[in-house]
């Protein structure tokens, strides 16, 4: 259920603003509509890092030191990312950093699903990963597109 809410936060503004632009004639660039959703997504998920920090820290293996501090720092990074998307000179590097952060978070999501940590759907066990991993890949692609990344194209054309 939480992933559905996150998906709606992510793509809802794009869909709503696209509909409004067709109805009212008010035009907004597609990538701006997408970045609104990305900002809402990361602002919302950052709140969890502060409101439910103890529960979120359980998503990290016990051997990881400073788990609670890591949760707070990553929450701050998510808020900074949500904001920095709107600074023109920072948009692309912020997009890259958000994608890398999502790659960095994936092992915690896998760990918490395997050990059924009861936070954000992970209590469902490994089956949750059948939904979570494709969602995370979609999220990374959405950020890549909305922040006008081109490093995949550069790599492909250099081959």
Residue ranges and their predicted role:
Residues 1-159:
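Membrane-interface extramembranous regions
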